[in-house]
Curated annotation (Swiss-Prot):
Involved in both the retinal photoreceptor ribbon synapse formation and physiological functions of visual perception. Plays a key role in the synaptic organization of photoreceptors by mediating transsynaptic interaction between alpha-dystroglycan and GPR179 on the postsynaptic membrane. Necessary for proper bipolar dendritic tip apposition to the photoreceptor ribbon synapse. Promotes matrix assembly and cell adhesiveness. This is Pikachurin. InterPro entries: ConA-like_dom_sf, EGF-like_Ca-bd_dom, EGF-like_dom, EGF_Pikachurin, FN3_dom, FN3_sf, Ig-like_fold, Laminin_G. Keywords: Cell projection, Disulfide bond, EGF-like domain, Extracellular matrix, Glycoprotein, Heparan sulfate, Proteoglycan, Repeat, Secreted, Signal, Synapse. O-glycosylated; contains chondroitin sulfate and heparan sulfate. It comes from Rattus norvegicus (Rat). It is found in: Secreted, Extracellular space, Extracellular matrix; Synaptic cleft; Presynaptic active zone. Residues 382-560, 605-784, 823-1002 form the Laminin G-like domain. Residues 305-314 have a biased composition (Polar residues). Glycans are attached at residue 47.
Length: 1005
């Protein structure tokens, strides 16, 4: 033990032996009354403007702690800035304290200390610690959402949907806020709802006949985004327009059917409200406006028109039956739960709502549209809705139907009674309305124009569990019902009024106020079963929830096709998809077909079928910048239907797209450079089942369309933008997802028919090699599918017929005949060519000098004699060529700094032999033809060498327009002999060729 240690030990022993009145060592070793610093201090950055700090109470404090102060200062580059403080009160029995310090600078380092306070004053500061807030890049708010889409529902309501921006920022999006402006009246935006948890809503209580725009902001943990691009200006319907009027709270709060209720829902002056796209809110008991009345059967019957059917009007007001069990993984929940109390006292789970049950008493909780399960927590994809007796789906009110309408419905019932359709002037059947209901397995079509009801009853009853189709038609007072294409039943309403006012939603499968509709519709039961299709006035209604479909809201709805794919066995990479409520197809990848994709085959000429959801995809051959300003497609196709998409591509991050579609028998070419859509439409309709040639092109924002020999159609896209960038594949015959297509593309259905040729900017898209993906593409009925060309020949479709391109050594319609004699003088047919890659030949068609001589004869004014150039050709690529253009003989070359073209005019397409000699020495060139004398020329710039890596072609070449940059569109139609290079290097045209197509002996047939 050293000297110091010995001294301290003796000092401690002395201190312990002091009497009580003496000063203790503990007091002597510290300042009197000072509280120690907090313990176990922990610092952490919360975000870019705040940090958190946590500590424990100091040990052995002489007096009770009354509070703390956090001292913090920003550390600059050279010195610390002014110190700031934050006081923290002490909670009861708090051993650990945690606090957040905010309003700080992003990405900044702070020095932090803490001191405790007691009754005796400030304690000792803790040892300083450092913490740095997160950088600004780590705390970004979201990007603005995409421009919202608005659907006008009535004179006071619109449905709004939007997609989030491309970047959600540094944290997930938590909610949205919605704003509106009336451009004709307002100068600033008004927020109508904040912290919305979804991306589609219905706005109620708007002013009728008024212009509106809407915008959306997204919010995450770091703040709000910028305002989205405002929606297109929309105008709410006028009070007198068909389909006008409010639905929702304005109707559902009136629970009675009193005839003396003078309050008019149309006169409600509601404030703007913002609601989720979900079923109508709860019907409340005891509404002071309502008064239940009783109407006798005789009173009701006296108000009905006599139907043509002998059946008397029937009314079903029995106890609602137990709904059919929901089947499949998407529809698990049973009948909505019944409670003994009213909705005022019932608490429903999230994604559900309450409706009072007047038939049973009490109330029921119903799942919102798209939700299911015991707690309405399961997502249900609805395409073919299934109803359970208490279900319904709502669509916008019938429009343009006040005088006449036609509705077609395909359904399968599981119970004898139930309401299928209802739309009217009020939610409770008062005034004008139309309805379709099942009553004891008979269909009842009822409508009232305001002065008396018509009841039209089907003559035959439906079969439970079987599919049925029913068509309703009304024109003025007259109505018609047709079941399963049977004999129509007609009827007529009473009185003089012939128009129907439709203000409520169109209800399918039931209605929230079905209990009160019994007098009008004849039943208080909801439908039980499935609906496969619904069409109004000739337009098929997409029954999926909005915004994908037209269903605005609903209650307790399942999916009829749920589980249909559970037992499916799609092989070879096929996937199952429901195509009807009770049937499926396998989406087979390219090269497979059959019910389960069991058959492998080679795709030759694609056949597309709308019923099989066919499509194929191919990437753009070159990068997008090659197609920004010019795009041209040539397509040969045979349509089997008047509607469908032929070709489509688009840009995912802008409005750019181009589409070629069939629409009502016409061909339409649509494109958008980002500032407006151009639509070009063929003048005449196309004959179905026949082959047609189509050419469309776009230069900047100008478009051209020509079908067969119809008049050329020209048009222009709107706006000032002139380029189109497409970053997706080219989709042919259909698209994978019709919900993702651009709004103005016109794409609604897959194409039904065949496509045998697609050429993009002179480049052929080959089915076998270039198609990279697709589903359910089969072979068309065409001779080329049977591979008729023998000995390696390739089949070239020519509408209904074909041509064979035969390899060297074979000839005949199907290349079936071998050429046994040597070909001294080859004959070319316009799609022929000979190829040479011998270095001794190629070096004589490159470098600083070139000399070529040949004899030829032809009957065509255009055709290529000789070509050598880079492949692929680029701007200012080196090349050398000799050929006929519009009757003139042209010698051209480019040494890298510009093209030289030396031309000799003459009658060279006379079918006689002609001699031509083309000589180049550096930049200078000369061509001599027969006795016409020499023509000379010189290439521009400084380049003197011909630098080429490609092969030499004689008489033509593959993809001639593409490879020559459209200098030549076809090969020679004629013969060539005596081909000599460098004055003395004689080439045996056929024997020296490494490849060739369609070569025969000159003069042979």
């Amino acid at each position: 033990m050293d000297l110091i240690s010995t001294f301290l030990l003796h000092f401690l022993l002395l201190a312990c032996s002091l009497p009580p009145g003496a000063v203790s060592l503990r007091t002597a070793l510290r300042k009197s009354g000072k509280v120690g610093p907090p313990l176990d201090i922990k610092l952490g950055a919360l975000n870019c403007t705040a940090f958190s700090i946590q500590w424990k109470t100091p040990k052995r404090s002489g007096s009770s702690i009354v509070g703390y102060t956090v001292f913090y200062s920003e550390l600059g580059s050279d010195k610390s800035l002014r110190e700031q403080s934050h006081n923290v009160p002490v909670g009861q029995d708090t051993l650990i304290t945690e606090e957040v310090i905010g309003d700080l600078k992003p990405g900044t380092e702070y020095r932090v200390s803490i001191a405790a306070y007691s009754q005796t004053g400030k304690g000792r500061l803790s040892f300083p610690r450092h913490v740095t807030t997160l950088s600004q890049d780590s705390c970004l708010p979201p990007e603005a959402p995409h421009q919202p889409h608005v659907l006008v529902v009535s004179d006071s309501e619109v449905a709004l949907s939007w997609r989030p921006g491309e970047n959600e920022g540094s944290a997930p999006i938590q909610s949205y806020s919605v704003e509106f402006i009336r451009p004709d009246f307002d100068k600033s935006w008004t927020i109508i709802q904040e912290r919305l948890q979804m991306d589609s809503m219905v706005i109620k209580g708007l002013d009728p006949d008024t212009n509106y725009q809407f915008a959306v902001r997204a919010m995450n943990a770091y703040g709000f985004s910028l305002r989205s691009q405002p929606s297109n200006t929309i105008r709410t319907l006028g009070p007198g327009e068909a389909g006008s009027g409010r639905y929702g709270p304005g109707y559902i709060t009136d629970t009675g059917v009193s005839e003396d209720d003078d309050a008019s829902e149309d006169e409600l002056d509601l404030d703007v409200s913002f609601e989720e796209v979900k079923p109508l809110p709860a019907t409340k008991v005891g509404n002071k406006k309502s008064k239940k009345t009783s109407v006798s059967n005789s009173e009701m019957d006296s108000r009905l028109a006599q139907p043509t059917s002998a059946s008397l009007p029937e009314t079903t007001v029995a106890v609602p039956p137990t709904p059919a069990q929901r089947k499949g993984k998407n529809s698990v929940a049973v009948m909505s739960r019944l409670f003994d109390m009213s909705c005022d006292e019932t608490l429903c789970s999230a994604d559900s709502f309450c409706v009072n049950d007047y038939a049973w008493g009490g109330s029921r909780c119903h799942c919102n549209l798209g939700k299911g399960g015991e707690a309405c927590s399961e997502d249900i994809f609805i395409q073919y809705p299934q109803f359970f007796g208490h279900s319904y789906v709502t669509f916008e009110p019938l429009k343009n139907s006040y005088q006449a309408f036609q509705i077609t419905l395909e359904f399968r019932a599981e119970a004898e009674d139930g309401l299928l359709l209802y739309c009217g002037e009020s939610e409770h059947g008062r005034g004008d309305f139309m309805s379709l209901a099942l009553i004891r397995r008979s269909l009842h079509f009822r409508f009232n124009c305001g002065t008396g009801m018509a009841i039209i009853i089907s003559e035959t009853k439906i079969k439970l569990g079987a599919w049925h189709s029913v068509t309703l038609y009304r024109d003025g007072l007259n109505g018609l019902l047709q079941l399963n294409n049977g004999t129509p039943v007609t009827g007529q309403s009473q009185g003089q009024y012939s128009k129907i006012t439709f203000r409520t939603p169109l209800y399918l499968g039931g209605a929230p106020s079905a209990y009160w509709l019994v007098r009008a519709t004849g039943t208080n039961r909801g439908f039980q079963g499935c609906v496969q299709s619904l069409a109004v006035n000739g337009k098929k209604i997409d029954m999926r929830p909005w915004p994908l479909g037209k269903a605005l809201n609903g209650a307790d709805v399942g999916e009829c096709s749920s589980g249909i794919c559970d037992e499916a066995s799609c092989i070879n990479g096929g996937t199952c998809a429901a195509i009807k409520a009770d049937s499926y197809i396998c989406l087979c990848p390219l090269g497979f077909r059959g019910r389960h994709c069991e058959d492998a085959f080679t795709l030759t000429i694609p056949q597309f079928r709308e019923s099989l959801r066919s499509y194929a995809a191919t990437p753009w051959p070159l990068e997008p910048q090659h197609y920004l300003s010019f795009t041209e497609f040539e397509i040969t196709f045979r349509p089997d239907s008047g509607d469908g998409v032929l070709l489509y591509s688009y840009d995912t991050s802008s409005k750019d797209f181009l589409s070629i579609i069939m629409a009502a028998g016409h061909v339409e070419f649509r494109f958008d450079c980002g500032s407006g859509t151009g639509v070009l439409r063929s003048e005449d309709t196309l004959t179905l089942g026949q082959w047609h040639d189509l050419r469309v092109s776009r230069t900047a924002k100008n478009g051209i369309l020509q079908v067969d020999k119809q008049k050329v159609v020209e048009g222009m896209a709107e706006g000032g933008f002139t380029q189109i960038k497409c970053n997706t594949d080219i989709f042919i015959g259909g698209v994978p997802n019709y919900d993702d297509v651009k709004k103005n593309s016109g794409i609604l259905h897959p194409f039904s028919g065949s496509i045998q040729k697609i050429i993009l900017n002179d480049r052929t898209i080959h089915v076998r090699h270039d198609f990279t993906s697709g589903v359910n593409v089969e072979n068309a009925a065409h001779p080329c599918v049977g591979a008729p060309c023998a000995h390696g020949g390739s089949c070239r479709p020519r509408k209904e017929g074909y041509e064979c391109d035969c390899p060297l050594g074979f000839e005949g319609l199907n290349c079936q005949k071998a050429i046994t004699e040597a070909i001294e003088i080859p004959q070319f047919i316009g799609r022929s060519y000979l190829t040479y890659d011998n270095p001794n030949i190629l070096k004589r068609v490159s470098g600083s000098r070139s000399n070529a001589f040949m004899r030829f004869k032809t009957t065509a004014k255009d055709g290529l004699l000789l070509w050598r150039g880079d492949s692929p050709m680029r701007p200012n690529s080196d090349f050398i060529s000799l050929g006929l253009r519009d009757g003139a003989l042209v010698f051209s070359y480019n040494l890298g700094s510009g093209v030289a073209s030396i031309m000799v005019n003459g009658s060279f397409s006379d079918g006689r032999w002609h001699r031509v000699k083309a000589v180049r020495d550096g930049q200078s060139g000369k061509i001599t033809v027969d006795d016409y004398g020499a023509r000379t020329g010189k290439s521009p710039g400084m380049m003197r060498q011909l630098n080429i890596n490609g092969a030499l072609y004689v008489g033509g070449m593959k993809e001639i327009a593409l490879r020559t940059n459209r200098q030549y569109m076809r090969g020679l139609v004629g013969c060539i002999s005596h081909f000599t290079l460098s004055t003395d290097y004689h080439i045996s045209l056929v024997e020296d060729a490494v490849d060739g197509k369609n070569i025969n002996t000159c003069g042979a047939k």
